[in-house]
């Protein structure tokens, strides 16, 4: 059942008034594939626009906080924690992991996915002048805890 549709099939924001407040957490990932020279430039701190990982991390955190402004039926949430980690993976990939937490009545999957996505988009934006062929890939939810639907973890 699609919870964002009413009995006439119209979109609406789900009423969570009666849902219990529980601890909730979601972890999402994304990858940005690029030329080895581009990744080397980032890791060596030689990018002309500055510290790509630092800027992308802040963008991801800000995006998590702004998710309800971007996704129409998402509830505005009072996140209690957002963490974005970036790491070079091999010679041509940046791996992004975004983690969002709160004690609330609805999950934080969309916030974690938005954080990972905007982090990847920021890397693309900062590096497109030197590498137009970058690919953002594998944006997905890795794990979520809390709430009525319980625990979910992607299978390896």
Curated annotation (Swiss-Prot):
The keyword Transmembrane does not apply. It catalyses: (8S)-3',8-cyclo-7,8-dihydroguanosine 5'-triphosphate = cyclic pyranopterin phosphate + diphosphate. Belongs to the MoaC family. Substrate binds at residues 73-75, 110-111. Homohexamer; trimer of dimers. One of its GO terms (biological process) is Mo-molybdopterin cofactor biosynthetic process. Its EC number is 4.6.1.17. Pfam families: MoaC (PF01967). InterPro entries: MoaC (IPR023045), MoaC_bact/euk (IPR047594), MoaC_sf (IPR036522), MoCo_biosynth_MoaA/MoaC (IPR050105), Mopterin_CF_biosynth-C_dom (IPR002820). Keywords: Lyase, Molybdenum cofactor biosynthesis. The keyword Lyase applies. It comes from Pseudomonas entomophila (strain L48). The active site is at residue 125. GO terms for molecular function: cyclic pyranopterin monophosphate synthase activity. Transmembrane segments: none annotated. Catalyzes the conversion of (8S)-3',8-cyclo-7,8-dihydroguanosine 5'-triphosphate to cyclic pyranopterin monophosphate (cPMP). This is Cyclic pyranopterin monophosphate synthase. It comes from the Bacteria.
């Amino acid at each position: 059942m699609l919870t964002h549709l009413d009995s006439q099939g119209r979109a609406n924001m789900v009423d969570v008034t009666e849902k219990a407040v529980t601890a909730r957490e979601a972890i999402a990932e994304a990858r940005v594939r690029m030329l080895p020279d581009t990744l080397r430039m980032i890791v060596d701190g030689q990018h002309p626009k500055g510290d790509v990982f630092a800027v992308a991390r802040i963008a991801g955190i800000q995006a998590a906080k702004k998710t309800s402004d971007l996704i129409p039926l998402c509830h505005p949430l009072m996140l209690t924690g957002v963490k974005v980690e970036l790491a070079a993976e091999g010679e041509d990939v940046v791996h992004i992991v975004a983690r969002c937490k709160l004690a609330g009545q609805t999950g934080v999957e969309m916030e974690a996915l938005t954080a990972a996505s905007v982090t990847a988009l920021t890397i693309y934006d900062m590096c497109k002048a030197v590498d137009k062929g970058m690919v953002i890939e594998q944006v997905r939810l890795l794990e979520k805890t809390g709430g009525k639907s319980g625990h979910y973890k992607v299978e390896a």
